[in-house]
Structures are given as C-alpha cells and as structure tokens.
Amino acid sequence: MARNFRDKTVVVTGASLGVGAAAAREFAKTGANLVLVARGLEGLEKIAQELSAQTEVMISALDVTDYVACQRMLDSAHDRFGRIDVLVNNAGYHKRGPIENLDPEEIPRMVEVNLSAPLFLARLILPYLERAGGGAIVNVASLAGMAPVPGAATYSATKFGLRAFSFALAEELADKNITVSLVSPGPIDTGFIMDNIDEVTDITFSQPMSTAQQVGAAIVAAAANESTEIAMPKSSGILATIAYLSPSLARRLRPKLQAKGARIKAQYRSRNRS
C-alpha cells in the first residue's frame, strides 16, 4: 500500500528551482507540509508563495554543507509541524569539464554538496524519522552514477558514491520502518543545458531528456511506493545498467552514442540561433 503524505512533513533540499521545486509542487498535491531548503532566499520565497494556498510551507535559506544550520533547520521544522517524515536530498553541484581543466577548489565542493551533505542530512534526520514511527529518504542521483560520463568524472564519482550509500543505508534501516530510495535521472531539460550547450558533452544529447516535473513526480512515487531505485527515462536506465554491468561494452558503444549526440546537439544549436 502506497504511503499517504497528508499532514506529513517533507524536507526538500535544492527546492528553489528545477527538480527541487517540481518535487515540492508534487508533494503539495498530496497535502504534505513542506520544508523547502536552498541557498537562494528569493527563489524559496517565490515557490513558497506559489504553494502556500495548497499547504503549509516553511522555507530555510542555507548551504547544505553547513551542518549546524541544517540541524537548526530540522529543529525548527519539528517545532513547527510536530513531526518530520520525508527527506529529499536533491541539492547538487556540477562543474563540467575534464578534470585537468577544473579549478582544484571545485572538486571538494562537488564532493561536499553531492555526497557529504546527503550523508550528513540522512544522519541528522534519523532521530526525527524514528520519532515519527518511520519515514522515507529519497536521494536524487544520476544515470552518471551508473554509467560514468567523460567530462564529468568528479560528478560521476559523487553520484556513484551516493548510489552505494543509498543501497547500504536501506539495509541498515530496514527494521526501523524507514525506506531509502534512489531516483537516477538522465539529462533534465531545466534550461541549464540549453543555456550552456557548448559546455555539455556530446554524449549527453544522445539520450532523451526528462522534464523537471517528471523527475519531481518520480521522487514522490519513490517515497510513496518504497522504491529501491527509479532510473529514468526507462530506455536510458536500461542502457546505463548495461554500461554499469559491462564497462568494456560501454566503451565500444560510446563512439556511436557520441556521434548521435553530436548530431542532435548541432540541431539544438541551430534551433537556438534561428
């Protein structure tokens, strides 16, 4: 039986735009109380204003790598709503390019936001979930955590780590009525890819893009149905699974996928200029 989120409390990080905002909208439809977290106050205020007619919304502008601030946020959320039931670890950071071209400071930043912060937030929220009698943690990873992408080596590594953490944590918490789910999307049409088309690797364009709304709906479904992992879109998830199981086969397929992606990327670039 699927979970009912009415009057439950859901914490969403990276909630001011894109997938996080989409997940907030989808959870609002279920009647859940929302705790929306992001660095930018203006974006949080905008999404809160949009959703406040549907449900109770609390916002908290903070950096997810500031664990003292995260603890205060959770305490405040519990004080306001009396319970916390779901954590969506969605906040992420991605700096594209070969590792030799990356500013060395970008590497620990990606690790801290994409991997360390979800681990710490999961740890911080556990007492609240146990107090509520159980709950759900949904970690937003990427198909790059199954099939690493050249030009995104550090990002891929963080998502591989988040995937491993999710599966292990699910086993640790199985007897506590706390589920841990993973949502692993491919490229997402949030505008960033098209606005930075020259920085995006050709192979990215070889796969169909999901919308933020589709990923947001998958996050709610994962929490409701206690899914282990939702890889999306399905066709790309199958391809990523093959690449994960057979890296040598993935290397043989990569030139064809890069060529396909280059053609589609050129079409997008031409369309943007017209």
Regions found by a protein language model. Give the residues of each.
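Conserved glycine-rich cofactor-binding loop
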Residues: 9, 16-17
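Conserved glycine-rich Rossmann-like NAD(P)H-binding loop of the short-chain dehydrogenase/reductase
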Residues: 30-47
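The beta1-alpha1 cofactor-binding region of Rossmann-like NAD(H)/NADP(H)-dependent oxidoreductases
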Residues: 61-73, 104
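Substrate-binding pocket helix/loop in short-chain dehydrogenase/reductase
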Residues: 98-99, 103-111
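Active-site helix of classical SDR
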Residues: 122, 158
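Residue(s) in the substrate-gating loop at a strand-loop-helix junction
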Residues: 142
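SDR active-site lid
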Residues: 172-236
